[in-house]
A protein has these predicted regions:
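Short, surface-exposed interaction patches in beta-rich subdomains
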Residues: 10, 25-38, 44-58, 63-197
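Low-complexity/repetitive intrinsically disordered segments
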Residues: 1-8, 16
Length: 197
């Protein structure tokens, strides 16, 4: 579609592929094995999605996900705009944003990779096994479920403070518990906060 909004609702199929040049894309109550969405300029909203693989690319616009279950992986790339994710379950999640905030609330994932060039990264009410977070400019705050002893973690910032469960760790915090769960966070400029309770 070259210009205009795209709305897809109440669809069950094998594959959904959407390419939009200018306009918003909305998916609601979709069940498909593979879902691919590419948008050059406009918001992307996905709610009530069940899939094996979900891929979203946006050059300019906000991305919003709510109530998404993916058996295998979720991949999200945004050049400019916020990424807001609520209530997702997936094995692998990869998120990359060049300019904008990344906010994730109520996530249950096995492996997560999150990269942001400019903007904050926030995870609340998160359940993860392996998490790798990289920020260039912005604060990183992770509020995860469980016990601190359940995780090995390495948190390091070049310019900013590191805080683990409300304890100041300076510019680097590291603990090796020989746990199966691993958190690695690096930041060039900005604070890092890890809270596991």
């Amino acid at each position: 579609n070259n210009s205009g909004d795209i709305n897809c609702k109440n669809i069950t199929c094998e594959t959904i592929t959407i390419t939009e040049a200018l306009g918003d894309v909305e998916l609601d109550n979709i069940t498909a094995v593979t879902i691919d969405v590419i948008n050059n300029s406009g918001d992307i909203n996905c709610t009530n999605i069940t899939s094996n693989e979900l891929s979203i690319e946006d050059d300019l616009g906000n991305i919003y996900l709510d109530k998404v279950i993916c058996e295998e992986n979720i991949s999200i790339t945004n050049s400019s705009g916020d990424i807001d994710i609520n209530n997702i379950e997936s094995t692998d999640v990869s998120i990359e944003d060049d300019l904008g905030n990344i906010t994730m609330i109520g996530i249950d994932i096995s492996n997560g990779t999150i990269t942001n060039s400019s903007g904050d990264i926030t995870i609340e009410d998160g359940s993860v096994e392996t998490l790798n977070v990289k920020g260039d400019l912005g604060d990183i705050e992770l509020y995860l479920k469980g016990e601190l002893s359940d995780y090995d973690y390495t948190l390091e910032t070049d310019l900013g403070d590191v805080e683990v469960n409300e304890k100041d760790e300076g510019s680097k915090g590291e603990v090796i518990n020989n746990s199966k769960n691993l958190i690695e966070v690096s930041n060039d400029c900005g604070d890092i906060k890890l809270d596991i309770k």
